[in-house]
Amino acid sequence: MTWLDDIRWDRDGLLPVIAQEAATGDVLMFAWMNREALARTAELGEAVYWSRSRGRLWHKGEESGHIQKVRDMRLDCDNDVLLLKVEQLGHEPSIACHTGRHSCFYQRYESGAWHAVELVLKDPEHIYR
C-alpha cells in the first residue's frame, strides 16, 4: 500500500483539486487528478492534472508557460479533495486561468446576473503556443 491508496478516488478514478496561491491564499482554479497525475505532481513538484475534455494528462503551463510550482499538498478530512498551495509562474501578475485572468473564479453573482470582476491580464490569443 502506498500514500496514493489513502485517497478516496471517485468512481472514475479521479480526485477534485483546488489550486490556491501559496503567498496570497487566492483560489486560482479547480481541476481533477487521476492517480498518475498526482504521482507526477509529487515527483516533479509542479502541478499535473487530468484533463477530462482532452482525455489526457495536462502539465499546467505546458502550452502557456504558466507553471504551478507546488509548495504544499493537503488532503481534506474525508481524503477525497486535494488542496495544492502553489506558486503561479510565467507572468507577473500571475495568470492561472485560460481566459488570461489571475483566477478562474472571476465571475461574481450580483443582482441576478454574473459579472466579470477581474481584468484580463493577457489576451489568451497571445498566451497559448
From Swiss-Prot:
Which residues are listed for Zn(2+) binding in this entry?
77, 97, 104
At the top level of its lineage, which domain of life is listed? Bacteria
Q: Which cofactor does it need?
A: Mg(2+); Zn(2+)
Query: What chemistry does it catalyse, as a reaction equation?
Result: 1-(5-phospho-beta-D-ribosyl)-5'-AMP + H2O = 1-(5-phospho-beta-D-ribosyl)-5-[(5-phospho-beta-D-ribosylamino)methylideneamino]imidazole-4-carboxamide
Question: Which pathway or pathways does this protein act in?
Answer: Amino-acid biosynthesis; L-histidine biosynthesis; L-histidine from 5-phospho-alpha-D-ribose 1-diphosphate: step 3/9
Q: Does the keyword Transmembrane apply?
A: no
Q: What is its EC number?
A: 3.5.4.19
Q: Which InterPro entries match?
A: PRA-CH, PRib_AMP_CycHydrolase_dom, PRib_AMP_CycHydrolase_sf
Q: Which Gene3D superfamilies match?
A: Phosphoribosyl-AMP cyclohydrolase
UniProt enzyme class: hydrolase
Cofactor, how bound (note): Binds 1 Mg(2+) ion per subunit.
Instruction: Give the UniProt subcellular location, in the record's own words.
Output: Cytoplasm
Q: Where does Mg(2+) bind?
A: 76, 78, 80
Q: What is its main location?
A: cytoplasm
One short Pfam name that applies is: PRA-CH
List cellular component terms (GO). Answer: cytoplasm
**Which BP terms from GO are recorded?**
L-histidine biosynthetic process
**Briefly, what is this protein's role?**
Catalyzes the hydrolysis of the adenine ring of phosphoribosyl-AMP.
- Family stated for the protein in its record: Belongs to the PRA-CH family.
Q: What name does this protein carry? A: Phosphoribosyl-AMP cyclohydrolase
Organism classification, top ranks?
Bacteria, Pseudomonadati, Pseudomonadota, Betaproteobacteria, Burkholderiales
Q: Which gene encodes it?
A: hisI
